[in-house]
């Protein structure tokens, strides 16, 4: 009954014992909890252990409690079998490149997936039809598909527009860096953005930049690079280069790029220098090459122009302007002449810094709730681990399979946790009346014979405000360690096992210790499907009516009930 419209004189309260009046108590937030869980892609939803609690406190309050268990199944076997198909040509290198390229291309795609149960967003926008079978496979559209779909569903219209602009600029920067690394400036539209071109002196160059590079086909760029440098052993695999480019766009600023292998025009993405490019360096209309200091002076205007092109309703706050260049730098700029390769490296650095600063400015415009989605990011950690393992020669077929498995599990869990977080934590109205006491994620793997292969549980009962991010950090650390330590269980002594459990911050009731350790040597081919379950215990306020008419109706109902019991007792009949 608490899930229905209980307004006075509504059809739901017309009959006795309500008599046209709301009930004397309301479970605040209970309906919102049901609606949020029903609107997501869960296959099964169980609401249990509904009860009441009145702890000894002043003033005395009555609370409702409820434990929910919502789950869905992911078809792991179909994707894992896909990895063995002939399109990988039976070689590990091609298998690695195909998987990596599939993930990077998907992350930069524009797929929008939604959960079952809702066709219209909260602001009235029509959501696309869900391909339930596609979503239930472990071969969905990657971190940029499922996660972006969840993010767009929970965002306001203004935030959605900002997020789309951020994504467009990140994709454009990724494609630009890749084109620069492999000299893929074949078209006039791309060629005008070579470092040193006069387009970088225009205040709106970021908008033109996004239009020129955001819509390029990621996989086609990789194929073009492979054809151009086929047989060159001194050039890095284009798939790994694209992964490094993508990682660079996730950096918070230009300083953070060092860990991605990207740092300025000396770009370590392939083993060649910019001077390999045929032809002369681009020049402005007066025949003079643009210098880095000139591009640096235009940066604040370019960033603000890119942000200001969005509708006014999206703009909330202003970033402090970038510091103006010192006077001596301005004087030096007037005397600058064209310099060799180092100058072009500085120009490329300036392009990266300007794009990242614009992304940061757009993120500052997001609402607090939308900015919090960064807490559930995971792709960068997985890409970095894959590239590091490849460089160190530590990666085998088992490592790659485990990487794929845990990447997709992380995608599903992170996306769902963010959805739940946005409804139950970031939603201030909900948190005003309801707390999350316990959060638990349960993952169970099954083989083709429906026999359990492994089982893992992560549980948190910490501060309700941080319970989701705390649990996600543990799960992500666990997944990364499982991939990194692939196949190491057999050689572990007791001390190594305890060190591993400490590294993943293993806790009691997080699955049997032997099962946790066996996961390190688990053969992914045995897994056919995985059930992912999210268990949440809620505690909400019970509102007690003070309206005299409602209280009088309650007393009348209780009196009639008591009279019926007494009459039945006199007749010797059970009520």
UniProtKB/Swiss-Prot annotation:
Pfam families: Adeno_terminal
Keywords: Covalent protein-DNA linkage, DNA replication, DNA-binding, Host nucleus, Phosphoprotein, Viral DNA replication
One CC-aspect GO term: host cell nuclear matrix
Region annotation Disordered: where it falls in the sequence: 314-340
One annotated GO molecular function: single-stranded DNA binding
Modified residues (O-(5'-phospho-DNA)-serine): 510
Post-translational modification: Preterminal protein is used to replicate viral genome, upon genomic encapsidation it is processed first into iTP and finally into TP by adenovirus protease.
Keyword NAD: no
Entry superkingdom: Viruses
Site for Cleavage, residues: 116-117, 265-266
Disulfide pattern: none
Annotated motif Nuclear localization signal, positions: 309-318
Transmembrane segments: none
Compartment(s) of residence: Host nucleus matrix
Site (Priming of strand displacement replication by covalently linking the first nucleotide of the new DNA chain): 510
A GO biological process held by the record: DNA replication
Keyword Cell membrane tagged: no
Biased composition (Acidic residues): 328-340
Subunit field text: Heterodimer with the polymerase; this heterodimer binds to bp 9 to 18 of the genome. Interacts with host POU2F1; POU2F1 binds to the auxiliary sequences in the inverted terminal repeats and tethers the pTP-POL heterodimer to the origin DNA thereby participating in the assembly of the pre-initiation complex (POL-TP-DBP-NFIA-POU2F1).
Family per record: Belongs to the adenoviridae terminal protein family.
Role this protein plays: Protein covalently bound to the viral DNA that acts as a primer for viral genomic replication by DNA strand displacement. Assembles on the viral origin of replication in an initiation complex with viral polymerase, DBP, host NFIA and host POU2F1/OCT1. The terminal protein stimulates the template activity over 20 fold compared to protein-free templates. Neo-synthesized viral genomes are linked to two preterminal proteins, one for each 5' end.
Protein name (record): Preterminal protein
Organism from which the protein derives: Fowl adenovirus A serotype 1 (strain CELO / Phelps) (FAdV-1)
């Amino acid at each position: 009954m608490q899930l229905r419209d209980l307004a006075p004189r509504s059809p739901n309260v017309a009959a006795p014992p309500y008599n046209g009046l709301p009930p004397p108590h309301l479970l605040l937030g209970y309906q919102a909890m049901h609606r949020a869980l029903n609107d997501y892609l869960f296959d099964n939803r169980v609401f249990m252990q509904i009860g009441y609690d009145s702890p000894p406190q002043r003033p005395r309050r009555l609370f409702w409690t409820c434990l929910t268990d919502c789950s869905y199944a992911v078809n792991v076997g179909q994707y894992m079998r896909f990895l063995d198909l002939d399109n990988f040509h039976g070689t590990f290198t091609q298998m690695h490149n195909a998987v990596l390229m599939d993930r990077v291309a998907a992350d930069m795609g524009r797929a929008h997936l939604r959960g079952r149960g809702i066709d219209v967003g909260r602001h009235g926008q029509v959501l696309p039809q869900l391909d339930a079978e596609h979503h239930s496979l472990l071969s969905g559209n990657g971190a940029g598909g499922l996660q972006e779909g969840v993010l767009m569903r929970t965002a306001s219209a203004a935030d959605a527009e900002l997020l789309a602009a951020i994504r467009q600029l990140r994709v454009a920067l990724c494609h630009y860096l890749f084109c620069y690394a492999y000299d893929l400036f074949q078209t006039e539209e791309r060629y005008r953005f070579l470092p040193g071109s006069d387009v970088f002196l225009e205040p709106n160059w970021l908008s033109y930049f996004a239009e020129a590079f955001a819509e390029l086909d990621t996989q086609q760029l990789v194929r073009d690079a492979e054809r151009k440098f086929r047989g060159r052993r001194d050039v890095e695999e284009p798939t790994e280069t694209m992964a490094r480019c993508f990682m660079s766009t996730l950096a918070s600023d230009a300083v953070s790029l060092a860990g991605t292998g990207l740092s300025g025009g000396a770009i370590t993405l392939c083993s060649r220098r910019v001077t390999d490019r045929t032809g002369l360096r681009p020049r402005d209309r007066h025949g003079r090459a643009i210098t880095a200091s000139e591009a640096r002076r235009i940066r604040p205007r370019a960033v603000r122009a890119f942000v200001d092109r969005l509708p006014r309703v999206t703009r909330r706050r202003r970033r402090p302007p970038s510091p103006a260049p010192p006077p001596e730098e301005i004087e030096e700029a007037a005397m600058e002449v064209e310099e060799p390769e180092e100058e072009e490296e500085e120009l490329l650095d300036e392009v990266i810094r300007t794009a990242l600063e614009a992304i940061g400015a757009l993120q500052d415009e997001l609402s607090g709730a939308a900015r919090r989605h960064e807490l559930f990011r995971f792709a960068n950690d997985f890409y970095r681990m894959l590239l590091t393992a490849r460089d160190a020669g530590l990666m085998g077929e088992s490592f790659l399979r485990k990487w794929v498995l845990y990447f997709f599990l992380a995608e599903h869990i992170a996306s769902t946790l963010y959805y739940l977080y946005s409804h139950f934590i970031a939603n201030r109205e909900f948190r005003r009346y309801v707390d999350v006491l316990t959060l638990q994620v349960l993952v169970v793997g099954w083989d083709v014979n429906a026999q359990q292969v492994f089982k893992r549980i992560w549980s948190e009962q910490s501060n309700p405000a941080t319970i989701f991010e705390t649990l996600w950090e543990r799960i992500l650390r666990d997944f990364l360690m499982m991939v990194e330590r692939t196949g190491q269980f057999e050689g572990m002594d007791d001390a190594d096992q305890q060190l591993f459990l400490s590294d993943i911050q293993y806790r009691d009731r997080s699955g049997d210790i032997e099962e946790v350790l066996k996961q390190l040597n688990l053969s992914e081919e045995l897994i056919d499907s995985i059930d992912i379950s999210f268990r949440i215990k809620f505690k909400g306020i019970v509102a007690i009516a003070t309206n005299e008419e409602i209280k009088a109706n309650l007393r009348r109902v209780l009196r009639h009930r008591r009279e019926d019991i007494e009459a039945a007792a006199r007749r010797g009949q059970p009520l």
